[in-house]
Amino acid sequence: LAVRGAGIPEPVKPKSGLNRTREKQDGFEMSQRLMLTWMTSYPELFGEIAKYISPEDFTKPLYHTVAKMLFEQYETGQLNPARLLNYFTDNEEQKEVAAVFNATIPLETDEERKKALLDVVCRMKEDSIAHRTASLEPTDMQGLMKLMQSKKELEDLKAGKLHLHISFK
């Protein structure tokens, strides 16, 4: 009361860290949503993206399902995102999937697009590796080898040893 503003600092309430975890999760989900948008907005990039990203890299169940269906369509040469909407019967899921397909990526130059796409690929791989590490059985040597390969690939991408060969023309 009378002490406030008298030069005595007010006690600071410690932060719980809950919001930071949620923000991190939101960032990973945004990366997955952006990747789906890239894949449907620029189908000509699909082959290059598929070298680094697979449906297993989508850790949010809804996005994993959508990615799996998109990859199947791509493999048959019939990429049609609108057809996927019929698969989802829940209104909320339909809205979320439609939002992914109708999103815009507000980047001006090809250089900005390439950097953004590389950032999304790296972020998704990081999340995927963390997710798979957390659920890996201690005796799964083959899974461990795949994780190590994924980590090496991610390090190479970040270091510029591997390149996304993409063009937005």
What do these predicted ranges mean?
Residues 1-169:
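A charged alpha-helical hairpin associated with nucleic-acid processing machineries
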